[in-house]
């Protein structure tokens, strides 16, 4: 998993509440078990019309935001079903950070497992960031995981809380497999001891 330390990039404003996982990646794209290739279908029903043409008004179809790496969204982002394809699609598009007043619990935890930093901030601070994001490509936000801060293009700084274990996993690029591999020596030692103690197993 890619490490996350500091990110300076374009933030796309998505001022919608209750953005559920079906909006993030519709059910027809859930057949794959690959984590790559889903970015083109991120927010599919909002990005494309029935003929597959881009809807110009949608934020990620606008030239200023096509290379966005941050999303600033409304309350309860990632609600709905627990599909892990949602963070897969977000990551595959190029988004590494989502900022919102709140997140659905399962989506929130899935983000960390896929190298995405979800940041929960008070509504009034999200409103400031939303306005900053609306400035377009010339306005770049900086997210510093080490200091747990978000800095606007105007230099305004907001601090966020984060579980130390989740922070470590992101900064070191550790997913579930990586965490297991950290303990591989202890696992091997246990298995050898268990085999000697119970050779009949």
UniProtKB/Swiss-Prot annotation:
Give the CDD domains listed for this entry: IPMI_Swivel
GO CC term, one of those recorded: 3-isopropylmalate dehydratase complex
- What GO terms in the biological process aspect are recorded for it? L-leucine biosynthetic process
Is Amino-acid biosynthesis one of the keywords?
A: yes
Please give the pathway this protein is involved in.
Amino-acid biosynthesis; L-leucine biosynthesis; L-leucine from 3-methyl-2-oxobutanoate: step 2/4
**Subunit structure, per the record?**
Heterodimer of LeuC and LeuD.
Name of this chain's protein = 3-isopropylmalate dehydratase small subunit
> Where does this protein come from, organism-wise?
Roseobacter denitrificans (strain ATCC 33942 / OCh 114)
């Amino acid at each position: 998993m890619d490490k996350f330390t500091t990110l300076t990039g374009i933030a796309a404003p998505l001022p919608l509440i209750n953005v559920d996982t079906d909006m993030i990646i519709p059910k027809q794209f859930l057949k794959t078990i690959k984590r790559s290739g889903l970015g083109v279908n991120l927010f599919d029903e909002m990005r494309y019309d029935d003929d597959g043409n881009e809807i110009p008004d949608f934020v990620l179809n606008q030239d200023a935001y096509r290379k966005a790496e941050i999303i600033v969204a409304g309350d309860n982002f990632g609600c709905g079903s627990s599909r892990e394809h949602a963070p897969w699609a977000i990551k595959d598009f190029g988004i590494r950070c989502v900022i919102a007043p709140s997140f659905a619990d399962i989506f929130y935890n899935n983000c960390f497992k896929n190298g995405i930093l979800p940041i929960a901030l008070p509504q009034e601070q999200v409103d400031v960031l939303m306005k900053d994001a609306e400035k377009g490509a010339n306005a770049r936000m900086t997210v510093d995981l080490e200091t747990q801060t978000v800095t606007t293009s105007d230099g305004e700084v907001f601090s966020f809380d984060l579980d130390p274990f989740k922070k470590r996993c992101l900064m070191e690029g550790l997913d579930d497999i990586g965490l297991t591999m950290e303990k591989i020596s202890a696992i091997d030692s246990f298995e050898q001891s268990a085999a000697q103690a119970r050779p009949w197993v």
